[in-house]
Amino acid sequence: MKTIVICSGGLDSVSLAHKVAAEQELSGLLSFDYGQRHRKELDFAAACARRLGVPHQIIDIREIGRRLTGSALTDEVDVPDGHYAEETMKATVVPNRNAIMLAIAFGVAAARKADAVATAVHGGDHFIYPDCRPGFIDAFQAMQDHALDGYADVALYAPFVNVSKADIVADGARHDTPFAETWSCYKGGARHCGRCGTCVERREAFHLAGVPDPTEYDDPDFWVAATGSFVAEEVK
């Protein structure tokens, strides 16, 4: 199956790219610059494409991103510290982000005669992000079936939608994902902060998967307190 992977440069999407490269025909990586403060993640997506020997395209949607105000990822709003399952993490929601990116990706896939678009949404995202949930994935596929009816048949491949980030780490390890060559931190500093929701979730995932974490964090122990009142099943 000829597949285009939406790759941010994060742990999930880079692991997905390695999975697709091993199990299917990886035809390229597609990334989006939406004005995110952690834009450095795109450098890791580019490195992934070079490593896997496939084309990489960055689509500039910063003008759209500027209209999606109020998010800590695109606006002058502080990125909150803590676990993903906390109410404060709703500050990191970029409205309709996945729907926008997937719609563009499906158009690109149809034009390139690809069979599928792969996205790395996962169970840990369900609590905060509505466009990462199984219902959204199913509805988006149904919408695209109508949108491309008679022109192209493109499948939405979301193998992680019902699994945890720890499961992704385990899968990535099986496919030799170089985890040190991925970027998660929403704050976009020189190193992973270790305190924002995605850093906490990243650190927790390695622990639960029993896989060594090669990441350098400014605060490597914060995750213990942040995850103390949660278990992985609660945020799936």
Swiss-Prot record:
- Cysteine pairs forming cystine bridges in this chain are none
Binding, Zn(2+): C185, C193, C196, C199
Which co-factor is required? Zn(2+)
| Cofactor binding remark | Binds 1 zinc ion per subunit.
A GO MF annotation of the entry reads:
zinc ion binding
Pathway listed: Purine metabolism; 7-cyano-7-deazaguanine biosynthesis
Give binding positions for ATP: C7, S8, G9, G10, L11, D12, S13, V14, S15, L16, A17
Q: Name one GO biological process term.
A: queuosine biosynthetic process
What's the domain of life for this entry? Answer: Bacteria
What is the main EC category here?
Answer: ligase
Q: What is its EC number?
A: 6.3.4.20
Q: Which UniProt keywords apply?
A: ATP-binding, Ligase, Metal-binding, Nucleotide-binding, Plasmid, Queuosine biosynthesis, Zinc
Catalysed reactions, semicolon-separated: 7-carboxy-7-deazaguanine + NH4(+) + ATP = 7-cyano-7-deazaguanine + ADP + phosphate + H2O + H(+)
The family note in this entry says: Belongs to the QueC family.
Q: What does this protein do?
A: Catalyzes the ATP-dependent conversion of 7-carboxy-7-deazaguanine (CDG) to 7-cyano-7-deazaguanine (preQ(0)).
Name of the protein described by the UniProt record: 7-cyano-7-deazaguanine synthase
Q: Which organism is it from?
A: Rhizobium meliloti (strain 1021) (Ensifer meliloti)
